Amino acid sequence: MKKKERKITHKMDFGVTDEQAGAAMDALNKILEDRGQSTGAIILGGRDLSDDQITPLVINDTLHKITGRWYYVGDTKTKAWKDPSAWHAAYWYFVADYLKERFGKDWCLSSEQSLLFNAADGRIPRQLAIRTPQADTHVVDLPWGYELLVVHSDLPEKVEYERRFGLRLYPLETAILAVSPGFYQMNPMEARTCLGLLPGRKGIAEAAIAGGYHIGAGRLVGGLISVGNELLAEAILSSLRNSCFDVNVCDPFLGSVKIGPDSCAIATRIRLMWMRMRPAVISEMPDDFLRTSWSPSKVKERMDDVFQDDAAASLAMEGYDVKENLIRAVAGGEWEYGTLCKEAEETDVAVTIGYHEAFRQVQTDILDSMTGGRGPEHLHHRILDWHERLMKPLEQHGLNDGEIPHDYRQCEGFIRGSEHIPVWWINVPFAMMALSGLLIQEDNAFVRAVLGLFFIDYIRPVRTGSGLFARLYMNSQLLAGGYPWTVIPANEARAFEESLEKARVTGEISDLARKIAWHSLNSFVAPKLNGEDPEQD
């Protein structure tokens, strides 16, 4: 099969000739190819493309203005004015490129923004504060209601360069010393995560003395004690007092949470989020009397019966246009690839075949866990095997776009329409390791179902199918807890995604847990509920 074309193409109009359109598109595709960048691309007029090249691309909705002569490349599958996904993907690349172009190296994020970024906070700030001595204080308006607050201010003595996007940040220890007490109380998860990242005492003590951070040092030491790192706290305090540096220790938090040190911010963040979310999930659990004990034969029967509905709903949630007759043909096993491709888009055909194979592997793994294999709490270890099954047809027919089956993603992974920026791909293994430890230790299957779904989606361990695997894992744990295999119907998909987005951005998991509980209950007694969502009561 011919490999699917992946370059950006659009039909041109508004009086732009085909020659102008083609030349502009070729120039843009060459830039993207040279950068190895398919998402998040930033274009500066006059530097990257000429005005004659930019004009047709703007007219044709390929480039979208940010400010001045800066543009981002739109998502070719959606309309930019309806979906901010492409802007979210481009945001941090723009910030780094724009500020470098204006100020060279004379800028950095504010101390608070530096800590939020270091803490693996995936949210895009509505207003980003940066410091520079090269400009007066002013605000730069950005798309979708975002702002860049440029503050005229000196820079810290040392500025650190961040590799993922090219940002310039406060050094970690200086940022913690410099932030106001309100940061600890408004952003306790991020503050605790950064305290867990702190290096040895020498650099911290030196930064405190050099900057004269008497009050900040007291908060830092008190914060370390609060998170359970008394050893480092005492060492820093001893170094400061030996240097005759006055410090009054105070706990900047409203309560203590013991986390211990960790060199990976996302690992600490996941553990803190789990601790915060778990009680909320338990409060939304369905009543125990609704649970049943599934036999292996009943699990197989249920999964066989539900596959077509599950595939239609789950693939649609991932943006695929898969028809019932295609799913029915694949599930029936009597099909020919070329024939299916005459009736549907090839990518939809391949992904349906792949999902069927992944679903069957999930079924095998669940039955194995019920008949003497490793317990269901270990099923998250099988995600890469499920990924391999999903990707095999795509790889066979040249549709995998370079993605490696049975491996964590090797590139950025963005979520359509979300303000959450998933884990940097380099840190995905560490994030999954932290999640694994939490899932294995958790004895409540409903908690594993909800938080497993959430964190797999939050991390996005693979480029293609993370949402699919999150829901497959959720259902594996629902079965383990005595709940039925649960399908999120098409008419509820948007509300379900909104609850998931709320959890990603705000950390509030209750709505998501409530919807999973309700859909699970509805799978038991659908005729009695008449499809009424409790959110509508």
Residue ranges, per PLM feature:
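Minor-groove-contacting beta-hairpin "wing" of winged helix-turn-helix DNA-binding domains
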Residues: 69-75
